[in-house]
Curated annotation (Swiss-Prot):
GO terms for cellular component: extracellular region. One of its GO terms (molecular function) is sodium channel regulator activity. Residues 1-22 form the signal peptide. Coiled coil: none annotated. The keyword Repeat does not apply. It comes from Buthus occitanus tunetanus. This is Lipolysis-activating peptide 1-beta chain. Keywords: Disulfide bond, G-protein coupled receptor impairing toxin, Ion channel impairing toxin, Neurotoxin, Potassium channel impairing toxin, Secreted, Signal, Toxin, Voltage-gated potassium channel impairing toxin, Voltage-gated sodium channel impairing toxin.
Length: 95
């Protein structure tokens, strides 16, 4: 049986690793979290989120104590926002 001390040491190791590598977050559209932003700030997240069609842009936040990630606001799931922007730029695209 694994002792409590071994579990505790493993838990602390995972937290320490997450704090060091917390800027490397992979996209997760379900949670609205896209990419790590440790050291980049809100301007970086706003650009990233707009590339992912977030109507409200984005900000660099700390969704949990061991990770800094871009939080995108109102991601457009059906691409309507993107298509409307294209139609404004290229009126000939209208159906």
């Amino acid at each position: 049986m694994i002792s409590v001390q071994v579990i505790f040491i493993a838990f602390i190791s995972i937290i320490a690793f997450s704090m060091v590598c917390g800027g490397n977050v992979f996209p997760n559209r379900e949670l609205g979290i896209l990419y790590g932003c440790k050291g980049y700030g809100n301007a970086f997240c706003d650009k990233v989120c707009k590339m992912h069609l977030a109507r409200g842009g984005g900000r660099c936040g700390e969704p949990n104590p061991v990770m800094w990630a871009c939080e995108c606001i109102d991601i457009d799931e059906d691409n309507g926002y993107f298509l409307n922007a294209l139609e404004k730029q290229c009126p000939l695209l209208k159906g």
